[in-house]
Swiss-Prot record:
It is found in: Cytoplasm. InterPro entries: DTB_synth_BioD (IPR004472), P-loop_NTPase (IPR027417). Belongs to the dethiobiotin synthetase family. GO terms for molecular function: ATP binding; dethiobiotin synthase activity; magnesium ion binding. One of its GO terms (cellular component) is cytosol. Pathway: Cofactor biosynthesis; biotin biosynthesis; biotin from 7,8-diaminononanoate: step 1/2. It catalyses: (7R,8S)-7,8-diammoniononanoate + CO2 + ATP = (4R,5S)-dethiobiotin + ADP + phosphate + 3 H(+). Keywords: ATP-binding, Biotin biosynthesis, Cytoplasm, Ligase, Magnesium, Metal-binding, Nucleotide-binding. Its EC number is 6.3.3.3. ATP binds at residues 15-20, 57, 118-121, 178-179, 211-213. Homodimer. Its cofactor is Mg(2+). This is ATP-dependent dethiobiotin synthetase BioD.
Length: 239
């Protein structure tokens, strides 16, 4: 039996569609006949529903997956305050322990064929006084899918994020253009610029361009993503 595959989804900023793209990847993997599970290791902005803490992003990922992980494995740290993780954690006297997340990820790999791990915010969001999401991705040692929110300034944001990922010794296995701003001028030209530079500098292919969707639909978004190409890259990536 082949070992489970996994990837880390990060973005150029917050609110640029990481959850939509993560859910779309899950739907694509399910369509490809895989047992697909999701992790949102740290979720900020949880609400109590029938005595259980829920986070909208984590719930959306569960809805897209066909393997549901136990809540403490899917989301080891569920924080109530909708704030940066280190601020929310300090407010609740919680220590965000990366070893606990790594252990949860190892457990998740035993339950599915592919595990999509969605980060929180951008790639350098603080988690503790000394660690950030880049350290988490490094600790998990996962190839990274970069979600680029297509809006003014996205070229610099994308290239800076790709540079930060590579600086940690991690591979940008591909990127997704998500058209968060339907009024953006010259979106195709921006995508062409990023397609050229990310491929040339980081060997990172464009996995798809998701149009502005209202309402957001992972199933529709999945039709715009090349999960077959992504799976091939994951299977041939150095371990």
């Amino acid at each position: 039996m082949s070992p489970a595959l996994s990837l880390f989804v990060t973005g150029t900023d917050t609110e640029i569609g990481k959850t939509l793209v993560s859910a779309a990847l899950l739907r694509g993997f399910v369509r490809d006949g895989l047992r697909a599970a999701a992790m949102k290791p740290i979720a900020a902005g949880a609400t109590l529903v029938n005595g259980v803490l829920h986070n909208e992003d984590a719930d959306q990922l569960d809805a897209a997956a066909n393997v549901l992980l136990p809540p403490d494995i899917r989301t080891p740290f569920m924080l109530k305050e909708p704030a940066a993780p280190h601020i929310a954690a300090a407010h609740e006297s919680v220590t965000l322990d990366m070893a606990r997340i790594v252990d949860a990820h190892e457990a998740a790999l035993q339950m599915a064929d592919v595990v999509v791990v969605e980060g929180v915010g951008g790639f350098r969001v603080p988690l503790t006084d000394s660690h950030d999401t880049a350290d988490l991705a490094f600790a998990l040692n996962l190839p990274v899918v970069l979600v680029v929110g297509m809006r003014l300034g996205c070229i610099s944001h994308a290239l800076l994020t790709a540079e930060a990922i590579a600086a940690r010794g991690l591979r940008v296995v591909g990127w997704v253009a998500n058209r968060v701003d339907p009024a953006m001028l010259f979106p195709d030209e921006n995508i062409d610029t990023l397609r050229d530079r990310l491929a040339r500098q980081y060997d990172a292919p464009l996995l798809g361009s998701v149009p502005h969707l209202s309402p957001a639909s992972p199933d529709v978004a999945a039709t715009h993503l090349d999960t077959t190409r992504l799976l091939h890259a994951l299977r041939t990536a150095p371990r």
